[in-house]
Amino acid sequence: MVNWFRRRKKRVVVPRLHTRGETPAAVNKVDLAELTPTLEPYLAQAAYLQLTIFETLSSALVTAPSTESKEAVSRAASFSLAKHHGLVAELARKGVDAAEAMKPYAARIDDYRRRTLGANWHETMVTAYVTAGLLDDFYRTLASGLPAEPARRIAEVLDTEDGHELIMGELKRAIENDPKLASKLAMWGRRLVGDTLLIARSALAMPADGHSEEARLEPVFTELVAAHTRRMDALGLTA
């Protein structure tokens, strides 16, 4: 059974997240390559999202509790900024002004960032950990529908160091020092998944009548959530 989130006027769809041990009904999984946007909108959205992750980590840097934490967060932020620059370089190859290309998506993505930033340093760090992981996985998979040569270069950009280990180390230390954080951060992580899948889905080049694709998208997003669950497990948190 598929349960979709709906927004008034504009229908936005995210697959239901299955609980552990639950087996979804068999469906014909869509190949994301069929729904990949053309190169310019792909790059513009991916680049702006990397910039957003950098902004999130920059916010965490300001309130980091120690010099060691500031150093770790700054390094993680630099990796996201490097990915942003790598994707912007691909736009430049096409003679496209990156700032202009990103403008149509900025308001929607900025709203997503505001809703997922977190109320404190620990939540902001979980936001960076969860959203960067999910979005990198999504855009890496989506790149398979791009022309071969730019797809290869984009994969190289997205496969570079991501800072997850640095963020995970900081969060593990925080949870060890205050075990009560675990349940709060696990809950926050679960809240982030829906919003992040919505922003990912908005990048897809859906047909005018995309209703037939919705059920076929569920296994794709279920795979993304499975990878997210493994990352949360690595933190000792329940996804």
Regions from the language model: what does each represent?
Residues 1-69, 73:
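Short, extreme N-terminal leader segments that mark the start of a protein/domain
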Residues 24-44, 105-128:
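Acidic/His metal-coordination segments adjacent to aromatic residues that form catalytic metal sites
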Residues 181-239:
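Extended, helix-rich structural scaffolds rather than catalytic motifs
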Residues 3-11, 76-103:
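Conserved alpha-helical segments that form or flank metal/cofactor-binding pockets of metalloenzymes
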Residues 38-43, 68-82, 124, 149-163:
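Alpha-helical scaffold segments that form or flank carboxylate-/histidine-based iron centers
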Residues 54, 84, 88-91, 136-139, ...:
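A structural signal for well-ordered alpha-helices, especially hydrophobic packing surfaces
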Residues 42-46, 50-53, 57, 114-159, ...:
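Acidic/histidine-rich alpha-helical segments that form the ligand environment
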Residues 143-179, 183:
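Charged, well-structured binding/catalytic surfaces in domain cores that contact anionic ligands
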